Amino acid sequence: TPPAVIMMVGLQGSGKTTTTAKIAKRLKEKERKKVLMASLDVNRPAAQEQLAVLGTQIDVATLPIIAGQGPVEIAQRALQAAKLQGFDVLMLDTAGRLHVDQQLMDEMQAVSRTSNPTETLLVVDSLTGQDAVQVAQRFTDQVPLTGVVLTRMDGDARGGAALSMRA
C-alpha cells in the first residue's frame, strides 16, 4: 500500500537535499508518480527551507514545516500526510551526519524504524574517493542500505569508489 518511502542518508555536504529533489522530479515526470518530499534535517539552518524552495521550483509537494519537531515526529507526520493525501512516494531527506556521530546515527535508525523505508539510499560525494568504502560500511552497519548515489561525477573523481563500495 502506498506510499513507497525512500530515505536519503549520507555525510554532511554530500548533496542529499539536491539529490532528493532530482529523484523526486524524475519520479514525477518520467514515472508519473505523486511525490511528497519531507526534510528531517533540524540541525542545519535553512535545510527545510532549501527543500521547500526546490519543491516549488520542480513543482513537487513538500511537507509544511512545523518548528520544534524532531526528525522522528516529522517522519511520522510525513507518512500520515502521504497516506491521507494519496501520494505514491514519500521522500525523506535526513540530516547530514559525520559517520562517527553516534547520536545522529541513532536518530537515523529511529527514523528508519518509524518509516520502514522501501529504499534507503546512501548519497556519497564522488570526491570522497576510497574513504567512501568506510563511509558505506559505517552506514550499512546502522541501517539496511538498498543503494548508493554518487554525486559530483562531473568533477575530477574516478569511478573507483563506486566499484570499491560494490565489493
Show which residues each predicted segment covers.
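P-loop/Walker A NTP-binding module and the surrounding RecA-like catalytic core of P-loop NTPases
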Residues: 2-167
